[in-house]
């Protein structure tokens, strides 16, 4: 019994309870819980493996680059020797070995091995760092073998090449050590001297594969001076005999590597691993001579071995081919220790500019260098330049960081050797090397022989901050490249460091926190804190020399450099001949070509040639590369140049700031704020990236309103202020300093197009622009709120502070600010801001948001507006001095006007015609990501829900007008476009060629829900009957059958979705007898569609006025019934059936309907989802028979399923002057018709029906003797309706047959024995009864034209039919009947379709008015049980 009880309780569970119970049981399943844990572990393991794989691939890539660098070095050596590089050794060169093919390594195994050698060289090293990246031995061994073979071949080639160099340079008299480096100097002699090394250090021949990796990429090659001139002969070679060999014992530290340049050939830089215990530094002194000659001197490197690897740095410099006589000499290069994991590349590319070589004769610069002492963390570097500063002539790869010691060369017994025309670049230190020590400067050389003798004009620069003058190498510490990989986190700790090194390490470490707000907003980037920095620039802007600075300033300079380095963004390097966009004037950019590149302290400058040969020197932030940038380089706040069309259609270039990246909301476009105040959406090909980016990009904007808008946007990003506007909405906007009334015309993402009412001028503006009244109101109130909250006496001192920000009420231009009174809290003193800066950025409270002042359609999400403070007040208390406060932002491009002569000045369209935003139409690509492979992928779902499943968003908005709250619906497409009405939805579907979504799937009624929960069932148990689909798949949507009342089975009826002609009935469906259209726009233009014209012209038959041009479907819905019928497009039409707006009924039933058993009316139909007004529901089908044959049929059972095709008769009544008397609408009241007063005893005891509950026909036979029925002819208003609708007892219910008056017959004539439902509305006469009788006697000629027929056709749904046969009657129905012509234009056979006459909630029964005439059947009464307030109580 208990089990049966449990089963019974289980059966009584509702669907939701059952789902919850099943979910709970599933959650408690131990196997499921265990499986979830396992899946979580597997997912975490997969993520870890992905991270490991990414790291491994990165190491592989770096190793591959090292191998390629080694190959480029060898090619460079061959090029210097005038030989051709080959993949195998030549027999003439004595190679005799196996071919050494260069293998292109796909995976980067070498870098992983290279990291190991950086941490230690010997096997017994205790400080060896091993990193486990999760890669298995099996996956790494194959790649390791390939890398090892390639590196062995490359190493062999290097050794052979060194030997060959030794053979070919026998003319040198001074032997060189392998650790010495030859620095090529420009010589006045055309004779290049080839210096050969004595021998190759045996340490190069290392068998360990890991060591070979390092040896190949960092092998030592002495620098060879190969300076050839095509028009001069070689000079004799002379060498220097003086040898100075001090022994320097260095500690194991990371010695920064000094970059060097090469010209006209592949650059290279080699570092040799040595293990000698001491370093012998042998400088040489070059004596100036009228006859230029080469000075060679030897240096021996001895370095104490430590866990770090030690390499010798070499330099190579080659002058231009057209330069004058050059002098070469050799200088020593101390071994440098390079960490491979920190230095990404050890080779710098060199580009020698021809224009620079021509300037080599102009500038004469001489720098006196003090002898420097090589310490543990610094390397003595001597870089030779010719008289035009070869450092500025050469370019290094932007990816390679020049690494030099911080500060300047220290005192040493071995000074650098410099020729009489060289400008030696000082050493640099990377701000990211904390172990480097600033070296001090000595005033006198320690040895007279070490004195550096120079000629030409002497120019000594003593700078605290060394600056490198390389063309394309990264600037010194102040301009650190983001690509530099020099980090000290992986370097081994150094235990033996001096106190000076420790202090430098602290000074050079990056700042813990860099406050962007600490810098002045409208002032230029502050220079270095070092007062001794005084770079000297030559007249030709190609050479700038720096001399060592004093050690007392080293720490401060290093710290400042580190701070500046972390702020500097990546700068794009351009080459000569590159096409660019340059800033010619304010808000005007033009195309040009780079003619010359110059390196400055704060970045490169470019000499750009524009049209007509006009040349301007521009900084990097005023030049943009003329090629589309990559998406990964773009970010919010970056500076770009974009092309936009003016009002006259000309393309103009202007700079702007990017504020939106592509996303679904903006339809995958970029939003750019132009400097002239306009905003527009652009695609990637229309953008050009500015070469040099700045943190505070608004400084580049001159216009105050535009600068303020960009600044405010970036400060509150990603939560900017936005205002929600609708199409046609009235608002106010600022123009010329005053508010003007305007109307919203278009919406596009974050932009809105407004039209001013005064002159009808249109303008696209940003939704958060200060031009809008709502935005200004919100910002102004927030400022006032912040001012009151943080009010203090210090705020009164604001009058003495220069005003930098305008009030939120001010106009969009600076010239109009005088028209509006500013708010008193616009600017405050620095002291006040310093103490309250953390309090002013407060979010608006929810109470304030809900206040009436914040109601007008403004959406605020996590808004945190900064208070309006002066830029000078954003520095700390320690920095709020007069110098910082008074610092002003320099006016950019003040000198550019000098390049324009008066006769060349043109009228710039950019200044006269601002860029106009062009609205971009949608295309099929907008739905490409959601377009399904199968059209009916969501078959069986609610049609209104399907767009949401394809990433559309149905959003409800509200607005308060005159104290009343209004709601409206708008859709947001997957590409971000807002669709605010059905017309926009229709246009969007047509523009995107959407063949899987249709117009009837969208609804703008805010009270129609797409996912409304169905009302709970009245029964708790399982239904007595449930069939999943009574249509057996014939309908588009399945039609389930549910019986929760009794055990009545489903009707045994043949289901047919189409009408079936009976024997003897012929329906001509040939297209030859129909009219078709030739529309290609989806039949949206009613005036051109022939089918629409048929529907419109038919309305002329109705009395009361001209034709109704709006007749027919409106956005796939029929708002009201058309007695004259609707003509849909047919197969003869050329329009696309999927996109046509005049095809609806022919597509079949689209709603989710359900057949269910009512309580008292038999079977009925209800909807499972909300149905909007005018929606097509279904058709009424069955067998089409003739009325005459129906009269002959004596076996009339179930005649309540008969319907009359009386379309012709209904229209003829309209033609005769009848007026519609339909009372389907809830607001219509019949003023005069026959009313029924029923006095039946048993009926008074019946219960009350609920309002709008479905009713059905309950025919019964009534004895007129016992139950008196009185019929009164009086107006409806005079009759008192019964308080309670009555229910007929089942024992008295019996279906009866009722007669309906034939058309044209009088009421006293013969009557039928059955009743037929009419699809035409009842009409009332406007004329007298006599006149009506005369007209009714007039014969009907229209039907007689069809073979003299005089009777209507009837749809017999007794044995076969569809859902329409189950729809019950109601005196207040929610459906109306419409005659539709689809497959034939024969007026006798229209399709009978049901449409929703009002909004229908989910779970409501669908009903329609049968149009029975009371008293049409003699002696028989049919009671109405619809339960409506307007229920007449009787059908017949």
Swiss-Prot record:
Gene Ontology CC, one term: chromosome
Pfam families (alphabetical): DUF5604, MBD, Pre-SET, SET, Tudor_4, Tudor_5
Start and end residues of each Pre-SET domain: 1075-1148
Matches recorded under SMART domains: MBD, PreSET, SET
GO molecular function list: DNA binding; histone H3K4 trimethyltransferase activity; histone H3K9 methyltransferase activity; promoter-specific chromatin binding; zinc ion binding
Record's compositionally biased regions (Polar residues): 274-327, 374-395, 420-434, 526-537, 795-805, 869-885
Catalytic reaction equation(s): L-lysyl(4)-[histone H3] + 3 S-adenosyl-L-methionine = N(6),N(6),N(6)-trimethyl-L-lysyl(4)-[histone H3] + 3 S-adenosyl-L-homocysteine + 3 H(+)
Compositional bias annotation for Acidic residues: 513-525
Residue stretches making up the Post-SET domain: 1420-1436
Stretches for region Disordered: 170-200, 250-327, 344-570, 781-849, 869-894, 1247-1294
Keyword Zinc-finger: no
CDD domains: HMT_MBD, SET_SETDB1
Annotated positions binding Zn(2+) 3: 1083, 1129, 1135, 1140
Binding residue positions for S-adenosyl-L-methionine: 1161-1163, 1201, 1365, 1368-1369
Domain of life: Eukaryota
Gene3D superfamilies for this protein: 2.30.30.140, SET domain
Domain SET: 1151-1411
Residue ranges constituting the MBD domain according to the UniProt record: 938-1009
A GO biological-process term: negative regulation of gene expression
Biased composition regions of type Low complexity, renumbered to the chain: 177-190, 474-500, 807-831
Domain Tudor: 633-697, 724-780
Free-text comment on this protein's domains from its UniProt entry: In the pre-SET domain, Cys residues bind 3 zinc ions that are arranged in a triangular cluster; some of these Cys residues contribute to the binding of two zinc ions within the cluster.
Function: Histone methyltransferase that specifically trimethylates 'Lys-9' of histone H3. H3 'Lys-9' trimethylation represents a specific tag for epigenetic transcriptional repression by recruiting HP1 (CBX1, CBX3 and/or CBX5) proteins to methylated histones. Mainly functions in euchromatin regions, thereby playing a central role in the silencing of euchromatic genes. H3 'Lys-9' trimethylation is coordinated with DNA methylation. Plays a role in promoter hypermethylation and transcriptional silencing of tumor suppressor genes (TSGs) or other tumor-related genes.
PANTHER family, alphabetized: HISTONE-LYSINE N-METHYLTRANSFERASE EGGLESS (PTHR46024), HISTONE-LYSINE N-METHYLTRANSFERASE SETDB1 (PTHR46024:SF2)
Protein name per UniProt: Histone-lysine N-methyltransferase SETDB1-A
Annotated source species: Danio rerio
